[in-house]
């Protein structure tokens, strides 16, 4: 334990173990408590060595005692432990911790002579006089003295942190409590926070960063005069290298005070603000009012998040005035906008007080359902026959029964019978009309009707009188609506059920389906009482109003749309709806709308389903021989699991997913990410493995449509196909491969698995299948409307026509109905009828098109990824903004750079970006295509080989573009012009289906001169030549034939690859020569230098002969510019020549001047080091027939030469070069077999792991001879396992006896099955091949077998480690011995345990198992993890067994786990 062993020695250690943790307790102190205390001191900046003496312990106690009243349990335990150690050093005998505490405190008070310096909890925060204020630094007698912080202040700070959990209130609380504090006091406050070590670490990092910045901004001045106070460093301000007196002097010295306290406070505030943001991650921009959330709750959340924002008050004021209203829900936003500009918070709260409450929700629901419950339109004549209200008591019009002054009639107002009143009427149905009852029933008289019929008729009889005509008219109008209820058993339709549905016959179906374009309101009969009800899949229960079901009910309070409702719950009630009779539970109460919830809908067999397209799914299979993905689901956070569960349940309800059966073995990982608005989650599935094994698909649509290719039309409409992929069914046989799993937190429940029923997002087949389906769906529409332009790319559809507004809308409606009828949705929020139309990144108008707003990013620091995005935006803008350039921007990110690497801007790139910004500031517009006009393309050459072009019809520009791609380092304008024309031609064919007429800046003669030699450029469309300056010209004159009478130069260059030294020179036919020495060059550069020398030393006309294809290719291309310095010099020299003839000859072929110059420049440069090794390698191969790798390794010749030696050997070309690779096995495993050659028996043994063989000829295939060979083999090599076939010689008693004696495990295979002993079978074959190669070198078969074994063991290299079999076997045996030695050595480590610290965490962890102890580090196994820990952070302790494990301070006796204080 290092220094900690010296804390207590001998007798003191024995005395420690006698002291009890608590009075009369059983547990006593142990050495581990001292170890723990020494570790804890590091947290307070105190040295461990202080524990070794009485005085050191006193210093520790002086530091800790002010913190004890407000400190954590760890701090109190540390204080108590130090008190006990102090008593042991003072030779004071104590029995327990409490006695040691009292004794230590009394001694300290007596030694100082006053109790002033011992902090007391009852001490006031401020002096009684009040003059000094609540400042730790106060003035007394003209001097500044330091008053430690009171426990009350520290306690307030600790409670603030614990209660607010680093909420927004912590920062102002710290500012108030630390006013006037020194760094010493602030450190005391930070040390009081026992928990929240993550936050403390963040604050420490901020302190270190700020201290480093302070040191950088305030360098150390020169030497100071004696006695002068030094300037504070960053560590001084942090209080780690300065005393309290120094801090006070810096704060109050004259002149030039340094407020170290305030500076340190500011650093801490920065750290606290970072902690607040970490503990309160909600951004103020993300605080939005929910659709059902009250405004007051939203305001509370808004201001809580606003307090956490560390920004200027003016910005907070702006946030309050704008964001508070902007992020409110639509209902509150409507109210708030009516309050005018800058309303007060009180006005906003008052105005929105009722918004979102139960009463408003009930009112909104009633208004929304008013239309659904309003009777259908009735004929005008019937509508005129409205009757005045009539009293049920006296039969007169003009008043109701409640207002009637006449004596009350006897009998029931409901059925007309006497003996009971209406409230107790046993009849379920009023008998005087076939119409609604309850609150909606018309108030009709009980007396006779005007037609003389009895109003108290049964429901089966037709109504008469005016009221009967009204209901008859309404029923007729309902039938005229044509609404249908679709049957699930055949798609049949039936008229919507009316109020007399039971009397119309059984027209209902077993499983009704409702289209939800309108609210599904039907008539139900509850105990034969008709009621209009809404089928509500979102409601759990069913509630109706206006009916009586008797007294057999249970009172119940339920939460409804109008708040809490008192209801009566009836069970087992008979309900007839849609011609089906069921019994269910129903409630009656005062509800704004009658609803049937899921309890009844489930009984009826109904569910809410999303219609999937009625299309035959396309059969999809996996690639041949492939199986579906079987990847495990990785762990997810609880938040993501809940989001995925919600998404999957919704998709399952909508019919897009179904639960996977337990027999499905496939799985693909799933995860979730936040959408752009950061409020909703998006489910993603990693289909990479499924995409890899799925069959390939053809990309049907290779690009996106361009607006310049659209014909000009009067009317345009844009619509979107919602949930496009989720509307196309996936083939049923393929669904099993899309299975995925939703994990559960802590494995609390079995994981739920799903498969896709529709096309999944992220699967490679979805785009192709969707596009194919959409083409099939839209093809009939296109044929039926040939005058309509229909552009479809994925889920975006554009319809354009010259029809009238009504006809255009009609055709759009037809398309929507076509898509809706097949199960596709066309969301209204993405339906665009009026310009401008947002389409595919463009902005469309009837007569023009533009790009959507382009905003270039503004950044201080640019990374490679930022530049890539910037160039992408500029390239997108270049299709309509002429003059956009990106050449110098692209140069910024040349080479191998990571995406996050910072980019250094050049002046040219900055100028290019500024020029592009100016271009983008001027808005540009494009025109639409008119087929009758000619299509033209004009090409313009700008500076730096950047080309611009525009495609136009007359003066109307359809689109523009740029070209700056240079495929070669050295190029010329004509070649680039051909590439530009090629690009424009392909682009025009794709967009318009025709090639434009070109206007090019080149003369016909120039083009044809270049074209004659360079006709290989892939494809160039025909054009008319129109010369527009600046013209492209060829800069120098290359002739095709040698120039007679002119000096001829033979050039060559050479370079040494190791030293990078080279020579360049030439020889002429007139005897001249010149050689130049080069440094740090290459062969190509040397060849170019030689060519440049020939040009410089020649006349106006010259013939030059080169042997470099590289130089010939550059010069023949007639470049006009290059990035190479030498090539630019060559271009300048060739421009000055009248004529140049350049030819190429092959090198090293003995051609005249070329051979001479080759010798001239090769002296001392070119070295062929391996030539003398080729002949010995050939001799080696002729003797042993070594393989390529052995020759390369032994003789150091190139692999190409070694391969040539082997290929020229007739014996080695029978089967070609063997495929290397060994099957790894245990070191003691051998295989043995017998083979026959030339009538002799050869026994062969092979070491499986290395391929090493032993073989010899035996006289007979017997057990005795085999046993002798095995004994000989075991005496040479370690063998633990022998595998043979089950031949009689291997299964004999002799072999078994030898195997038993040596300790060999024997196993058998099948004699004629090569797989059972494949290694030795293959080696038999190789041995015979080797024997055939060297058979002529020996007479007897015995000799040649041993020679062949030597060749195979020592002359063939390859396989594992690129070694020979002999080298490999010896290496394996050596490695095995080393491993055994290390294992024996490391077995002693198991007796020790290791406690360790990680990173900056000061807490000790462990114990771990010691695996290895090195000089600088130890290797520790903790659970399943293996860690490497530096020796200085590890403590190795012998494991005595049976002791309590110590992994952190919380396991100390007397710590918080026992709830007791040491």
From Swiss-Prot:
Residues 512-516, 560-566, 599-611 are annotated as: Dimerization of protease. The active site is at residue 536. Residues 1223-1374 form the Integrase catalytic domain. Protease: The viral protease is inhibited by many synthetic protease inhibitors (PIs), such as amprenavir, atazanavir, indinavir, loprinavir, nelfinavir, ritonavir and saquinavir. Use of protease inhibitors in tritherapy regimens permit more ambitious therapeutic strategies. Reverse transcriptase/ribonuclease H: RT can be inhibited either by nucleoside RT inhibitors (NRTIs) or by non nucleoside RT inhibitors (NNRTIs). Its EC number is 3.4.23.47, 2.7.7.49, 2.7.7.7, 3.1.26.13. The record marks 222-223 as: Cis/trans isomerization of proline peptide bond. Zn(2+) binds at residues 1181, 1185, 1209, 1212. One of its GO terms (biological process) is viral translational frameshifting. The record marks 1010, 1023 as: Essential for RT p66/p51 heterodimerization. Residues 7-31 are annotated as: Interaction with Gp41. Mg(2+) 1 binds at residues 720, 795-796. Residues 532-601 form the Peptidase A2 domain. One of its GO terms (molecular function) is DNA binding. It catalyses: Endopeptidase for which the P1 residue is preferably hydrophobic; Endohydrolysis of RNA in RNA/DNA hybrids. Three different cleavage modes: 1. sequence-specific internal cleavage of RNA. Human immunodeficiency virus type 1 and Moloney murine leukemia virus enzymes prefer to cleave the RNA strand one nucleotide away from the RNA-DNA junction. 2. RNA 5'-end directed cleavage 13-19 nucleotides from the RNA end. 3. DNA 3'-end directed cleavage 15-20 nucleotides away from the primer terminus; 3'-end directed exonucleolytic cleavage of viral RNA-DNA hybrid; DNA(n) + a 2'-deoxyribonucleoside 5'-triphosphate = DNA(n+1) + diphosphate. A motif (Nuclear localization signal) lies at residues 26-32. Residues 1043-1166 form the RNase H type-1 domain. A motif (Tryptophan repeat motif) lies at residues 1007-1023. One of its GO terms (cellular component) is host multivesicular body. This isolate is from a Gambian case of 'neuro-AIDS'. This is Gag-Pol polyprotein. It comes from Human immunodeficiency virus type 2 subtype A (isolate D194) (HIV-2).
């Amino acid at each position: 334990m290092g220094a900690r062993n010296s804390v207590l020695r001998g007798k003191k250690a024995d005395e420690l173990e006698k002291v009890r943790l608590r009075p009369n307790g059983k547990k006593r102190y142990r050495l581990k408590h001292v170890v723990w205390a020494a570790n804890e001191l590091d947290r307070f900046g105190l040295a461990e060595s202080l524990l070794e003496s009485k005085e050191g312990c006193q210093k520790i106690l002086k530091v800790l005692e002010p913190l004890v009243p407000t400190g954590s349990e760890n701090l109190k335990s540390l204080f108590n432990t130090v008190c006990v150690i102090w008593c042991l050093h003072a030779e004071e005998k104590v029995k327990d911790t409490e006695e040691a505490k009292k004794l230590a405190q009394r001694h300290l008070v007596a030694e100082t002579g006053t109790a002033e310096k011992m902090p007391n909890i009852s001490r006031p925060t401020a002096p009684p006089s009040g003059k000094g204020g609540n400042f730790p630094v106060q003035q007394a007698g003209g001097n500044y003295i330091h008053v430690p912080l009171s426990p009350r202040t520290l306690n307030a700070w600790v409670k603030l942190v614990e209660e607010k959990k680093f909420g927004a209130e912590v920062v102002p609380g710290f500012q108030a409590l630390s006013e006037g504090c020194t760094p010493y006091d602030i450190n005391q406050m930070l040390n009081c926070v026992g928990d929240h070590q993550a936050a403390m670490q963040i604050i420490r990092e901020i302190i270190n960063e700020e201290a480093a910045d302070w040191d950088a901004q305030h360098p150390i001045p020169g030497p100071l005069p004696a006695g002068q106070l030094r300037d504070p460093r960053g560590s001084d301000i942090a209080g780690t290298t300065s005393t309290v007196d120094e801090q006070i002097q810096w704060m109050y010295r004259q002149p030039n005070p340094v407020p170290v306290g305030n500076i340190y406070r500011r650093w801490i505030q920065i750290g606290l603000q970072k902690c607040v943001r970490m503990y309160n991650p909600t951004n103020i921009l993300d605080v939005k009012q929910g659709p059902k959330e009250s405004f007051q709750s939203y305001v509370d959340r808004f201001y809580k998040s606003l307090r956490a924002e560390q920004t200027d008050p003016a910005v907070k004021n702006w946030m309050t005035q704008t964001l508070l209203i902007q992020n409110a829900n639509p209902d509150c936003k409507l109210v708030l906008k009516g309050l005018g500009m800058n309303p007060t918070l009180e006005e906003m709260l008052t105005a929105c007080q009722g918004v979102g409450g139960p009463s408003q929700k009930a009112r909104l629901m009633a208004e929304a359902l008013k239309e659904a419950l309003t009777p259908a339109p009735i004929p005008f004549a019937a509508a005129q026959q409205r009757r005045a209200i009539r009293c049920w008591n006296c039969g007169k019009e003009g008043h109701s029964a409640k207002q009637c002054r006449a004596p009350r009639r006897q009998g029931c107002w409901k059925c007309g019978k006497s003996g009971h009143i209406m409230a107790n009427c046993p009849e379920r149905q009023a008998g005087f009309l076939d119409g609604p009852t309850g609150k909606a029933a018309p108030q009709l008289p009980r007396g006779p009707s005007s037609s003389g019929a009895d109003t108290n008729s049964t429901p089966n009889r037709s109504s008469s009188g005016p009221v009967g005509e009204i209901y008859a008219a309404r029923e007729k109008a309902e039938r005229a609506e044509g609404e249908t209820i679709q049957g699930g058993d055949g798609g049949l339709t039936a008229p919507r059920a009316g109020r007399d549905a039971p009397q119309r016959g059984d027209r209902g179906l077993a499983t009704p389906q409702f289209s939800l374009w309108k609210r599904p309101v039907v008539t139900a009969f509850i105990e034969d009482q008709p009621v209009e009800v809404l089928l509500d899949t979102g409601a759990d229960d069913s509630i109706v109003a206006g009916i009586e079901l008797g007294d057999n009910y249970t009172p119940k309070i339920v939460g409804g749309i109008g708040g809490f409702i008192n209801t009566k719950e009836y069970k087992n009630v008979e309900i007839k709806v849609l011609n089906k009779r069921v019994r269910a539970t129903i409630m009656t109460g005062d509800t704004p709308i009658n609803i049937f919830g899921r309890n009844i809908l489930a009984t009826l067999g109904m569910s809410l389903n999303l219609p999937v397209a009625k299309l035959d799914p396309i059969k999809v299979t996996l690639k041949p021989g492939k199986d579906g993905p079987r990847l495990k689901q990785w762990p997810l956070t609880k938040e993501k699991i809940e989001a995925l569960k919600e998404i999957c349940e919704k998709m399952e309800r909508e019919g897009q997913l179904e639960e996977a059966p337990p027999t499905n073995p496939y799985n693909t990982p799933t995860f979730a990410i936040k959408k752009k608005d950061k409020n909703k989650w998006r489910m993603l599935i990693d289909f990479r493995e499924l995409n890899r094994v799925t069959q390939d698909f053809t990309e049907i649509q290779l690009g996106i449509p361009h607006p310049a290719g659209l014909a000009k039309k009067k009317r345009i409409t844009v619509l979107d196909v919602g949930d496009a992929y989720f509307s196309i069914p996936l083939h049923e046989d393929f669904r099993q491969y899309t299975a995925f799993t939703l994990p559960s937190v802590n494995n609390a429940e079995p994981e739920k698995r799903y498969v896709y029923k529709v096309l999944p997002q992220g699967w490679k087949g979805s785009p192709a299948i969707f596009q194919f389906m959409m083409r099939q769906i839209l093809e009939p529409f296109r044929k039926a409307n040939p005058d309509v332009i229909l552009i479809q790319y994925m889920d975006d559809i554009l319809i354009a026509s010259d029809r009238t507004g009504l006809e255009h809308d009609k055709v759009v409606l037809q398309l929507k109905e076509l898509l809706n009828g097949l199960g596709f949705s066309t969301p209204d929020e993405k339906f665009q009828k009026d310009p401008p139309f947002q389409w595919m990144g463009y902005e469309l108008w009837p007569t023009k098109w533009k790009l959507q707003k382009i905003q270039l990013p503004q950044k201080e620091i640019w990374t490679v990824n930022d530049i890539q995005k910037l160039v992408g935006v500029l390239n997108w803008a270049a299709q309509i903004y002429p003059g956009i350039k990106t050449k110098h921007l692209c140069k910024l990110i040349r080479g191998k750079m990571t995406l996050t690497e910072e980019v250094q801007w050049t002046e040219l790139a900055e100028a290019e970006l500024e020029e592009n910004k100016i271009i983008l500031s001027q808005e540009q517009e494009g025109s639409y295509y008119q087929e009758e006009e000619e299509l033209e393309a004009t090409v313009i050459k700008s500076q730096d080989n950047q080309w611009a072009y525009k495609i136009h019809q007359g003066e109307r520009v359809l689109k523009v573009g740029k070209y700056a791609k240079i495929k070669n380092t050295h190029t010329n304008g004509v070649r680039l012009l051909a590439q530009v024309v090629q690009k424009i031609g392909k682009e025009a064919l794709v967009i318009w289906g025709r090639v434009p007429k070109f206007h090019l800046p080149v003369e016909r003669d120039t083009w044809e001169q270049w074209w004659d030699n360079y006709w290989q450029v892939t494809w160039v469309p025909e054009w008319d030549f129109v010369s527009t300056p600046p013209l492209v010209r060829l800069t120098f004159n290359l002739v095709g034939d040698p120039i007679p009478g002119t000096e001829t130069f033979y050039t060559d260059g050479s370079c040494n690859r190791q030293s990078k030294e080279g020579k360049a020179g030439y020889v002429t036919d007139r005897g001249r020569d010149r050689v130049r020495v080069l440094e740090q060059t290459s062969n190509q550069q040397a060849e170019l230098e030689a060519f440049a020398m020939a040009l410089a030393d020649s006349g106006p006309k010259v013939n030059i002969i080169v042997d470099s294809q590289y130089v010939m290719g550059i010069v023949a291309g007639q470049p006009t510019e290059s990035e190479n310095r030498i090539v630019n010099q060559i271009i300048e020299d060739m421009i000055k020549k009248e004529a140049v003839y350049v030819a190429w000859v092959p090198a090293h072929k003995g051609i005249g001047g070329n051979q001479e110059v080759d010798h001239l420049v090769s002296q001392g440069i070119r070295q062929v080091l391996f030539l003398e090794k080729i002949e010995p390698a050939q001799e080696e191969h002729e003797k042993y027939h070594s393989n390529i790798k052995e020759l390369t390794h032994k003789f150091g010749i190139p692999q190409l030469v070694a391969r040539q030696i082997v290929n020229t050997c007739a014996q080695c070309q029978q089967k070609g070069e063997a495929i290397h690779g060994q099957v790894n096995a245990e070191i003691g495993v051998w295989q043995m077999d017998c083979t026959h050659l030339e009538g002799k028996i050869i026994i062969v043994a092979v070491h499986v792991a290395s391929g090493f063989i032993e073989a010899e000829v035996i006289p007979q295939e017997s057990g005795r001879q085999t046993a002798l060979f095995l004994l000989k083999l075991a005496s040479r090599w370690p063998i633990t396992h022998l595998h043979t076939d089950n031949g009689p010689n291997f299964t004999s008693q002799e072999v078994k006896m030898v195997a038993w004696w040596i300790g060999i495990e024997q196993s058998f295979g099948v004699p004629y099955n090569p797989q059972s002993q494949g290694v030795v079978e293959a080696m038999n074959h190789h041995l015979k091949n080797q024997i055939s190669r060297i058979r002529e070198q020996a007479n007897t078969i015995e000799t040649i077998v041993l020679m062949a074994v030597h060749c195979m063991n020592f002359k063939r290299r390859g396989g594992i480690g690129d070694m020979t079999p002999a080298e490999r076997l010896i290496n394996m045996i050596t490695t095995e011995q080393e491993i055994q030695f290390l294992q024996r050595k490391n077995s002693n480590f198991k007796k020790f345990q290791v406690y360790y610290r990680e990173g900056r965490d000061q807490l000790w962890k462990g114990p771990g198992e010691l695996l290895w102890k090195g000089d600088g580090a130890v290797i520790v196994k903790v659970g399943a993890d293996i860690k490497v820990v530096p020796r200085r952070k590890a403590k190795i302790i012998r494991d005595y067994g049976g002791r309590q494990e110590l992994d952190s301070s919380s396991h100390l006796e007397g710590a918080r786990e026992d709830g007791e204080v040491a």
